[in-house]
Amino acid sequence: MKTIKVLVVDDSAFMRKWISDFLSEHPRLEVIGTARNGREALEKIAALRPDVVTLDVEMPVMNGLETLQRIMRDHPVPVVMVSSTTTEGAENTIAAMQYGAVDFVAKPSGPISLDLYKVKDEMIGKVLHASEANVAALTAPRRQHPSWRPSFKAAARPQQAIVAIGTSTGGPRALETVLTQLPPDLAAPVVAVQHMPKGFTTSLANRLDALAAITVKEAEDGEVLQNGTAYIAPGGVHLIVREEGGALKARFDESPPRAGHRPAVDVLFESLAAIRLCRKIAVIMTGMGSDGTAGLKKLKESGNTKAIAEARETAVVFGMPRAAIEAGVVDVIVPLDSIAAAIVQLIGE
């Protein structure tokens, strides 16, 4: 099996050694170099041609965001960001996801030392996954966000609709593409699960809200879901939807993680399967693994459901869409830029 060559970029000598040592323990990973700042990183990427780069968000000389943008422009390669869990760190990390980073690892917030071992397996796993990412999808130019004027409201709509989106690796960029193309008068609420730890989902929702014509917010337990609003599942809890008093409400579920994920797409989709008097549109986009497929099977069995999967050519990682497609539970397969139009069309039918 091919060895994956990794460049480690961090201004801390301790962190460079720690990341290098941990990655080198895996038989498929070879650390071919390290860099202390963004300028050094760009030189070493050009010279060494790594398969994956780990990149600190906060660095002197050239920070992680500026470095990332230069990497994706000049030497496109899968990048895993290494970030702090501070509010500023989370905001910068979300920006990095939308500039083309494949994924990120949050540094432990406690004292350095044994806390670092908590993210060792996550670091190794995300670097391995990043090596399989579709770099063309990360660097593809994105359509300009539309300025909405026409109304998409249908003349008669006898039944409430709800849109549920599940995504993982590469998801923040995919969510931006879809949510910024939805009209503000969308005749359905949107609920979305993005695999992401607590704290980072707040920054994700805030950034998407600033860009989209619809309202985007982090979901709150017990709130009534409103048309024209997208609700992002908070990290650390499962998001479910319940029908209560004739309204659709967001609820939190603290049951154990599913396949390592909380929130999990399967849990959201399964909760929607119990809602009978509502048309359901499920969307599965880029992500590693198969989260969402089991829940989508239950959704389809419950009836009144249409499912959209992102096409291979635009998915950063095709795992989640492929699993759903191969299970035979998908109605529409479209590239990322066409998902919003497909959602609007299905709501209007």
Swiss-Prot record:
SMART domains in UniProt: REC
Entry keyword Cytoplasm: yes
Any single Gene Ontology cellular-component annotation: cytoplasm
GO molecular function terms listed in the Swiss-Prot or TrEMBL record: phosphorelay response regulator activity; protein-glutamate methylesterase activity; protein-glutamine glutaminase activity
EC number: 3.1.1.61, 3.5.1.44
CDD domains: CheB_Rec, REC_CheB-like
An individual GO BP term: chemotaxis
Residue positions where 4-aspartylphosphate is found in the record: D56
Pfam families, A to Z: CheB_methylest, Response_reg
Catalytic residues (UniProt): S168, H195, D291
Record domain CheB-type methylesterase: where: 156-349
SUPFAM superfamilies on file: CheY-like, Methylesterase CheB, C-terminal domain
Key words of the record: Chemotaxis, Cytoplasm, Hydrolase, Phosphoprotein
Compartments, record wording: Cytoplasm
PROSITE patterns: CHEB (PS50122), RESPONSE_REGULATORY (PS50110)
UniProt xrefs under InterPro entries: CheB-like, CheB_C, CheY-like_superfamily, Sig_transdc_resp-reg_Me-estase, Sig_transdc_resp-reg_receiver
Entry comment on modification after translation: Phosphorylated by CheA. Phosphorylation of the N-terminal regulatory domain activates the methylesterase activity.
Domain of life: Bacteria
Functional note: Involved in chemotaxis. Part of a chemotaxis signal transduction system that modulates chemotaxis in response to various stimuli. Catalyzes the demethylation of specific methylglutamate residues introduced into the chemoreceptors (methyl-accepting chemotaxis proteins or MCP) by CheR. Also mediates the irreversible deamidation of specific glutamine residues to glutamic acid.
Domain text: Contains a C-terminal catalytic domain, and an N-terminal region which modulates catalytic activity.
Protein name listed in UniProt: Protein-glutamate methylesterase/protein-glutamine glutaminase
Organism: Geobacillus kaustophilus (strain HTA426)
Gene: cheB
